[in-house]
Amino acid sequence: MSEITHRKKRLSSFKLIVLGFAGVIVLGALILMLPFSSTAGVVTPFHEALFTSTSAVCVTGLVVQDTGSYWSAFGQAIILLLIQIGGLGVVTVAAFFAMLSGRKISLMQRSTMQDAISAPKVGGIVRLTRFIVRGTFLIELIGMIVMLPTFCGNYGIKGIWMAAFHSISAFCNAGFDILGTAENKYPSLTGYIGDTTINIAVMFLIIVGGIGFLTWDDICTNKWHFKKYRMQSKVILVTTMLLIIAPAVFFFFCDFTGLPLGERILASLFQSVTPRTAGFNTADLPAMTGSSKAIMILLMLVGGSPGSTAGGMKTTTLAVLILSAFSVCRKKDDAEVCGRRIDGSAVKNAAAVAVMYFLLFFVGGIVISTAEGLPLSTCLYETASAVGTVGLTLGITPQLGVLSQLILIVLMYLGRVGGLTLIYAAISNKNQSGAKLPLEKITVG
C-alpha cells in the first residue's frame, strides 16, 4: 500500500495531465462502441470509436463517421461531453467538481491546475478555475442564444440541440458539426456561407476560446486599458489579430472570386479564423488555391494561445521565435517586446516546441502518403490538421486505412496535451545534473 502511495506521489503534474487525457479518451471510446451510441444500433469498431473519442477530447474535429447521421442522440451527447472536457481540460474539470463537493484543494493539486492552464503562479488558482468554468458556460450560452433563431428556423425544436452543440463545439475549437444527413455527409457549415449571424457567432466563439483563459482574466480585470495588460496578453492579442487579418486579405484576393462581396468577405474572414484549431469550414476547401492551402497549413500548426481551448504550437511560440530572430538581426542579446526582455528559456522552449510540431507534421504526412498512395501535399494538410487539433480536411479522413487513422490519433493526442507537457512528462528530473560539459562554439546559418 505504501509503495502505491509513493508511486502516486511521484507522478508529476505533467504526467497527470497526459494520463488524464488518455484515460478520458479510452473511456469515451468504450462508450461510443456501445450499440445505442449509433443510429443503426450496431457495435462501432474500436479503432473508429477511439478515433472519434480522441478527436473529441483533443478538440480536433476530424471524423471517420459523419457525426450527424452515424451517431445517435446519445452518441452525440457523449461526443459533446468529451468536447467540453477536452476544451476546458481534464484537470480543470476534475478540480471544479472537487470544489463543488466542498473538498479542500491541496497544494499539489493546485500545482497541477497551474500547469494545466499555464498560469504564472499557484496563488489565486482556485479563483481562476471558478472564473474559467463560469465564463465558459456563460459564453457558450450566449453563443447558443444567438444561433438559436437560425437553427430553430431550419430544424424546428431540434434547433435547440443544434445551437447548443455548435456553440460548445465552436468555443472549444472542436469543429464537430451535426448537420450531416445520410444523403449529405460531412457538410460542416458550407450551407451557411452567407449567413452573417452564424458566421459572426462561430468566429467570435472560436476567437474567445482560442485566446486563453489568462487573457480573459486580464481583459476582465483591466478592461480596455491595454497598457495594463500582462506582456503575454499583449503578445497574444496582437499576434492573434495579425494572424486573422493578413490571411483574410490574402484569401479575399486569391479565392472566393465567384461569391457576392458580402459572402466573399465572410468566407475570407471565416477561413482565416477557423484554421487556428477550430475546424469548421464554410467554403469548399479542395477548390482553394495551392498557396491558400499552404497558408492554412501554417495557421493550423500555429494554433491558438497557451491555456486556451485551442491546440497547435501556440501564438506565443511563433511570436517568441520571430522576436528572437529580430533580436539577432539587431545584434541584441535578448528578444524584446512591450518594453520587456523575453527570458532565454522561453526562446529555447519555443524552438523545441516548433521543431517537435514540424517533425510530427512532416513525418506523419510522409508515412500516410506512403501507406495510402495519396499526394504528399494532401497528407501534409491532414497531419497539420491533426497535430494542430484543427479538424479541417480535404476529404480523405473517412477513406484512410487503420494504420493512417492510428497515426492521426497519435498526432491529435500529442497536439492537444502540448509539446512541453509531453516532454516534461517523459523526462524525469533525475536526468538533470548540475555538472556542465565544456563549452565550444558551432557555426550556424
Locate the predicted segments by residue.
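Membrane-proximal intracellular helices of multi-pass ion channels
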Residues: 1-445
